[in-house]
Amino acid sequence: MTYAAPPTDGPPKGRELFKAYLRKVGSGEHTSSGLTREEAAHALELMLDGAASPAQIGAFLIAHRIRRPEPQELTGMLDVYRKRGPQLTTGKPAISFGMPFDGRTRTAPIYPLTALVLSSAGLPVVLQGAGRIPVKYGITAQELFACLGLQLAGRSVEWVQAKLNACDLALVHQPDHLPDAETLIPYREDLGKRPPLASLELLWTAHQGEHLLVSGFVHPPTEARAWKALDLAGETNVLTVKGL
């Protein structure tokens, strides 16, 4: 009787690379170590590109949540969003609001009205958001603007930039402008918890140039990590608001 020779190629390269990052964030409290900025960026890119397996991605997201992301890890992931997402510009200083992508369920969000007041006064406003996503499935920025008669979803980056130039208002909509990130949404539903990506979404702005970044937080440790991460990312004008 003969036996087939075992495969020699082994697991795909991306999965092997990802194992090293998973070991770092998934070990016990005495052996777990943080990723460098570059490693965190690479880990996120492997997830966005589907180079890591679904099991690896789920394990990484929940382990990272339990351990809590370190500032340089958030900065590394922010580097990826900055590179892959749209880059909007204005001829004058702008303001960008970092809002929860999974929306609101218990409070009435006023930031669409705030954005309209600011833009009508000539201050460019850049917002980022997505469709309804786990775990809250709250009302989203694009839905709120639609209620006011502004259809901001389903638009090209060129259209968004043109309206920012003309009206001082822009909404970057993840399904349209950062579709790679949409591939990670089902994991939120399966895990039942918000992964560190939710913290990343509060720190990201698509605006390039001088701006004030307003970011919300709930827990004080989250605020401290956000400040350090944004400082590493070169953000010099930041305002954090509890519960925003």
Residue ranges of each PLM-predicted region?
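Phosphate/diphosphate-binding glycine-rich loops and adjacent basic-rich segments that engage nucleotide
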Residues: 155-217
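Active-site-proximal beta-alpha loop/turn segments in soluble metabolic enzymes
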Residues: 61-65, 100, 141, 205-213
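Residue-level signal for inorganic ion chemistry
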Residues: 60, 145, 201
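Glycine- and other small-residue-rich loops at beta-strand/loop junctions that grip anionic moieties
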Residues: 33, 103-104, 129-130, 153, ...
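A structural signal for small-residue-enriched, beta-sheet-centric alpha/beta enzyme cores
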Residues: 9, 191-244
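Acidic, glycine/proline-rich low-complexity segments that act as flexible tails and inter-domain linkers
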Residues: 1-107, 119-121, 125
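A generic, well-ordered mixed alpha/beta core segment in the N-terminal half of proteins
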Residues: 92-162
